[in-house]
Amino acid sequence: MNCTEELESRIAKAEKRYGPFASTHEAMGVMLEEWTELVDAVRSNMLIDIREEALDLAAVCIRLADNLHDIEAMRARSVK
């Protein structure tokens, strides 16, 4: 499976399991968690894990961008 297909699969699974992000802050928290896991994999020089974590991070970023198609709804959920 190529990266694009893997991303599509990960995004679909996450949307089915979790639905849209509750807020931009939730998305940022998930991104930071994935970023930390990617950093750990890079520091360990574990190439398979690096690929997996890079795809996980990319999927979260794309999900956030997709969730912003309805900016007003996201804004309402993201107000302090």
Question: What are these model-predicted stretches?
Answer:
Residues 1-80:
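Flexible "arm" and connector segments at domain edges
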